[in-house]
């Protein structure tokens, strides 16, 4: 009799296709080559964890074992994402008769980790795949990594710039790199002209367009005419005129736009590309910029975190790679053909869609205890509160201040916000109460810091698909929330994909101990989380494990295991001199009190290990 598979409880067929599955052992497994993964090549995540834990790492402080939490990286998945993106664009170019090519870049801000950036440059060599930088540190990383790239790979220099940034970008051109300085505002042109003359290096520049096309929701907040970056079309044409007067219009090669991360539908993808292509054509035809070669469509290629393919929220997109590529190629081709302008090279800065799938965060369960119910907040009383609040609509702007006015409108907006927040809190509490009344809710204490591992959850409400690593052939019987070990009430994950307020989990019983522990994976987490992580309570980054496929039979090899920062290293980032300010002071006081022999080994262990809990007893559920 076939064992049951409860993977679909977590919608793994939605968000996980084609990289994640549940194997015959009831374990989460990775399909390292996506749809090209052959039978027997799936990598068992549970086995990876236990092999990693058995690894001995030699450090200056002696041999150590890995600690939780940990990030598992699968570079084979990263390569497949890159190959799939290029296949999608190459297919769209070939099928439409587009008379140029696609040549993309990876925005370093998405994941600055050395292995990730270097892998992408290596994997993308045949595609002339390049990098995008938005700061001087990122530019230095790009310059070093692209030294090994195929000549001609783009080094797109975005972000606000000072003279040092511009000079560094010009030095990259002097090194033979294809660095393009993208102007965010007109004033940056003066810096480029000045530094070019000083260094004797002729630049290649681009301009960033502020499009009128917008996307809804959180990720569209920096787009449109009121957006933070770029210039409106008229200002771009002024820049072209300024270059023409200086006899430097040949410097201008690229037009860049970015309407926001996580574009939800292909209609918006198409409209943005068509609008930008119109500006590109005007620069070529009406403003004499005949040397233009490239349209950089920026980021926005989304990830379907909730697996619905609906595009109806910030967590979902209603398309795949092929539809995205086709929308851009078709829009630019038709616009350029209508204007009689040669088709430009198409570039995208697709970071989230490249990096998300290749990395997962592994969280260790420490204990599980029932969440106490507030006896006064029965679901009937909560529903009554919601109905009562709904009947008390905030005053209109007109009644606030006679005829209204700016102050009245602002006051009304503030009241609406407070009203909405209170309604949301009550509705959320009602949802949890109904769930708890039916089955009870358990708080699973996890060896993690929300602020260090999934900061986007805390910061913007970003949701990641989460599921147990093992026991997926057993029905999960507990409604759980995840509680971290920080001293902060925000350190809790109690919202999940598909509008769930709990995550189906298993009891922490003898079966959990038999599996060597109970682990929950946060998936599609390879973009932004490490870069945005903070040090709340001085918890640090995780252990990093690099895993590669080793052929059939589920074979894999652990290429490297890197421990996360030690307590000593984290304390040092807060400007403490660990020896003078910490070690020497503790030694002095402990010696004076005659307890140094006891304190010394404890202090040493505390400083030289990761700040998370270590050597924790097997987890249990309190019923």
Curated annotation (Swiss-Prot):
Q: Does the keyword Cell membrane apply?
A: no
Tell me the cofactors it needs.
pyridoxal 5'-phosphate; Mg(2+)
Where does the chain bind substrate?
A: 295-305
The molecular function GO annotations come to: arginine decarboxylase activity
N6-(pyridoxal phosphate)lysine modification, residue list: 109
- Asked if Magnesium is a keyword of the record, the answer is yes
The protein's name in its UniProt record: Arginine decarboxylase 2
The species this protein belongs to is: Oryza sativa subsp. japonica
Name the gene.
ADC2
């Amino acid at each position: 009799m076939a064992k049951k598979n409860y993977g679909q409880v977590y919608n793994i067929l939605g968000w996980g296709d084609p990289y994640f599955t549940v194997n015959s052992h009831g374990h989460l497994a990775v399909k390292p080559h996506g749809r090209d993964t052959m039978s027997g090549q799936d990598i068992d995540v549970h086995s990876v964890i236990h092999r990693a834990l058995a690894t001995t790492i030699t450090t200056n402080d002696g041999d150590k074992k890995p600690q939780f939490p940990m990030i598992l990286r699968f570079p084979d998945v990263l390569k497949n994402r890159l190959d799939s993106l290029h296949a999608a664009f190459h297919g769209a170019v070939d099928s439409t008769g587009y008379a140029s090519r696609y040549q993309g870049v990876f925005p370093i801000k998405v994941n600055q980790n050395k292995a990730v950036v270097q892998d992408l440059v290596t994997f993308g060599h045949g595609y002339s795949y390049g990098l995008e930088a938005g700061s001087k540190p990122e530019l230095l990383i790009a310059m070093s990594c692209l030294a090994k790239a195929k000549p001609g790979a783009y080094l797109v220099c975005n972000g606000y710039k000072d003279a040092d940034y511009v000079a560094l970008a010009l030095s990259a051109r002097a090194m033979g790199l294809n660095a393009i300085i993208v102007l965010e505002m007109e004033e940056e042109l003066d810096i480029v002209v000045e530094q070019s003359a000083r260094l004797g290096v002729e630049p290649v520049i681009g301009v960033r367009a502020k499009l009128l096309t917008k996307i809804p929701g959180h990720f569209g907040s920096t787009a449109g005419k009121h957006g933070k970056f770029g210039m409106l079309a008229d200002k771009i044409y002024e820049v072209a005129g300024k270059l023409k007067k200086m006899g430097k219009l040949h410097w201008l090669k690229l037009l860049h736009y970015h309407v926001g991360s996580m574009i939800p539908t292909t209609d918006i993808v198409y409209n943005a590309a068509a609008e930008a292509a119109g500006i590109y054509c005007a620069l070529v035809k009406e403003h004499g910029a005949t040397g233009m070669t490239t349209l950089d469509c920026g980021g926005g290629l989304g990830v379907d975190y909730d697996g619905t393919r609906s595009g109806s929220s910030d967590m979902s997109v209603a398309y795949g790679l092929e539809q995205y590529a086709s929308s851009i190629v078709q829009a630019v081709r038709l616009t350029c053909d209508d204007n009689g302008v040669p088709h430009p090279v198409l570039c995208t800065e697709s970071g989230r869609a490249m990096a998300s799938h290749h990395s997962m965060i592994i969280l260790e369960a420490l204990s599980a205890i029932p969440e106490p119910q507030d006896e006064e907040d029965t679901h009937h009383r909560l529903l009554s509160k919601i109905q009562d609040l709904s009947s008390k609509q905030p005053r209109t702007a007109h009644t606030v201040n006679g005829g209204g006015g700016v102050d009245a409108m602002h006051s009304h907006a503030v009241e609406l916000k407070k009203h909405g927040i209170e309604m949301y809190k009550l509705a959320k509490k009602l949802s949890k109460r109904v769930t708890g009344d039916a089955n009870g809710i358990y708080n699973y204490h996890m060896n993690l810091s929300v602020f260090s591992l999934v900061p986007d959850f805390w910061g913007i409400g970003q949701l990641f698909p989460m599921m147990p690593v093992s026991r997926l052939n057993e029905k999960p019987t507990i409604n759980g929330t995840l509680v971290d070990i920080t001293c902060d009430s925000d350190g809790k994950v109690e919202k999940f994909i598909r509008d769930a307020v709990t995550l189906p989990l298993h009891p922490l019983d003898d079966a959990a101990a038999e599996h060597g522990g109970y682990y929950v994976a946060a998936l599609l987490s390879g973009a932004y989380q490490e870069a945005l992580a903070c040090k709340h309570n001085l918890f640090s980054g995780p252990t990093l494990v690099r895993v590669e496929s080793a052929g059939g039979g589920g074979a894999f090899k652990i290429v490297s295991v890197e421990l996360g920062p030690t307590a000593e290293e984290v304390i040092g980032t807060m400007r403490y001199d660990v020896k003078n300010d910490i070690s020497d002071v503790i030694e002095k006081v402990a010696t004076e009190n005659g307890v140094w022999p006891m304190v010394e080994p404890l202090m040493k262990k505390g400083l030289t290990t990761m700040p998370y809990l270590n050597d924790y007893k097997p987890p249990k559920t309190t019923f």
